[in-house]
Amino acid sequence: MKSAVYAFLYLDRMNVNQLVRERTPMPIKILQRRIEEVVLDCRILRYPKWMNTDRVMVAGDIKHAIKTGCFLAPDESRDPNSYMTAQDHAARVAWLIKFADLEKVTITIAENKVVDGNHRLSACIYSKIKVINCVVMPTTSKVSVIAA
């Protein structure tokens, strides 16, 4: 089930690790993983917990957002680290459930933490999707050369 692809990538996400902050080229693994494995490895209880929020989002929040048509579309100008209520997170997840192809979404994992894609992961969990694409960033700067 695990298919690996190796590539070099520059990332702009803040606070992932020193390699990213220094914009150092890193080997990146892209895997298809069972969502239940991701949840266990990343120690997620039910749904991811965001740092800047009022409380943990629950399935009822997502269900209510879908039922009431409260959908929050992606916005590139929105700071991903800014404060959002649990209802705002649920509206973002609801938008993904309604409009995104969840079979094709990708999340980014570094040091057993989802560093990009918590809303996508939440949408997949709620929709009972079995497999998700994961970009797995290494925790070390050592690069292995792999012949193609």
Named regions from a protein language model:
Residues N133-A148:
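Short, Lys/Arg-rich amphipathic alpha-helical interaction segments
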Residues K130:
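Short glycine-/polar-rich loops that comprise or flank the Walker A/P-loop
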Residues M1, M26, I146-A148:
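Short intrinsically disordered terminal tails
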Residues T106-T108, S122, N133-V135:
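Ordered hydrophobic segments in well-structured contexts
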Residues D61-K113:
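Short alpha-helix boundary/capping and kink motifs at helix termini
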Residues V5-K67, D79, Y83:
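An acidic, glycine-rich, mixed-charge low-complexity segment common to nucleic-acid enzymes
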Residues I109-S127:
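A sequence-level detector for short glycine-anchored, His/Arg-bearing signature motifs
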